A protein has these predicted regions:
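A short alpha-helical cap/connector motif
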Residues: 1-112, 118-196
Length: 196
């Protein structure tokens, strides 16, 4: 799936429309996610932070190509219409949403957890202990350090930085940067970690 395969309207830096659904992403996500999914063969992808649904719709479309289960959580429903994807209007921090995510990680085969909610540090550190060997976890609005964000990203790649490597319990949870994918995804303000 390439940029030519879908309706794409750039509105401003950090926001575009995907089939009429607003997405808050760097538009170069389309350069990385298809190859990433092709190379990893995930069984389950879970997103925390649906927002207005554009990125969720894109991941859902990729799920149809690559054959993984996908669902997404947001405590606030900002969707303008009924989505084609499995949207769960629940907290990801506790209660039923938390239990579903833990169950999804535990019994979902090879899992990717996409962390893009209201407190990415909390969400990463909450679920990282449940990851299995060869699972992946990614955080959006990421930079390795604040200095790196100011020097290499702000005003160029992505203006927002809501988590850095030092915030994330990677060593405590046996997580490593995901080979070449970490180097690619930093170009769209996503971290990419895998469980040893």
């Amino acid at each position: 799936m390439s940029k030519s395969d879908f309706e794409y309207t750039c509105q401003r830096h950090g926001r575009f429309m995907y089939y009429g659904w607003p997405a808050q992403q760097n538009n170069h996500i389309f350069d990385y996610f298809p190859d990433f999914f092709q190379s990893q063969s995930f069984d389950t992808v879970i997103e925390i932070g649906t927002s207005e649904g554009g990125f969720s719709h894109y991941i859902y479309d990729l799920s149809q190509v690559h054959g993984f289960r996908f669902w997404t959580y947001d405590i606030e429903n900002k969707l303008r219409k009924t989505p084609p994807f499995d949207f769960r209007n629940k907290s990801a921090w506790d209660g039923e949403g938390y239990e579903e995510i833990v169950e999804g990680i535990t019994n979902g085969g090879k899992v990717l957890l996409l962390v893009d909610g209201g407190d990415k540090i909390k969400e990463f550190n909450l679920y990282a202990p449940f990851l299995k060997s060869d699972d992946f976890i990614m955080t959006h609005d990421y930079a390795p350090t604040l200095e790196y964000h100011e020097t290499h990203m702000k005003g160029k790649i992505w203006d927002w930085c809501e988590n850095i490597a030092a915030d994330l319990n990677v060593f405590e949870n046996d997580l490593l940067p995901a080979d070449l994918w970490s180097d690619k995804f930093i170009n769209v303000a996503w971290s990419c970690w895998t469980k040893e």
